[in-house]
Regions:
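Acidic, low-complexity intrinsically disordered regions
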Residues: 1-109
């Protein structure tokens, strides 16, 4: 099961919440369906909800990351930071990522 790290991006939304992403070291990212220079769509489960999300990677970066912008079941934009904080996760926290094809579940470390 890959391990991720919730990173703050030092950019803030209008309400003051810092943008966040989940980064995964490429050495542990093999089960994730990522490709360099492409945004690969995934279903991200956090708590009891699921979201449309994207995995990104570039050849020069040592990590794969879950992009900070999501869509909920109704197609509305929602931030990964808001979803994570509403479910008790915080910046700099380590997490497990349970991977089942293109479905990724965020679990506490």
């Amino acid at each position: 099961m890959p391990r991720g790290h919730i990173r703050g991006l030092s950019q803030f939304y209008a309400d003051g919440l810092e943008r966040m992403e989940i980064s995964i070291d490429k050495h542990n990212a093999a089960p994730l369906p990522y490709q360099h220079n492409l945004r690969i769509p995934i279903t991200l489960h956090v708590g009891t909800q699921q979201y449309e999300a994207g995995l990104r990677s570039t050849p020069n970066m040592p990590v794969v990351w879950v992009s900070p912008d999501l869509r909920d079941n109704h197609g509305n934009k929602v931030s990964l930071a808001r979803v994570l904080t509403n479910n008790g996760f915080r910046k700099n926290q380590r997490v497990y990522l349970e991977v089942n094809g293109r479905v990724v579940t965020v679990l506490p470390f």
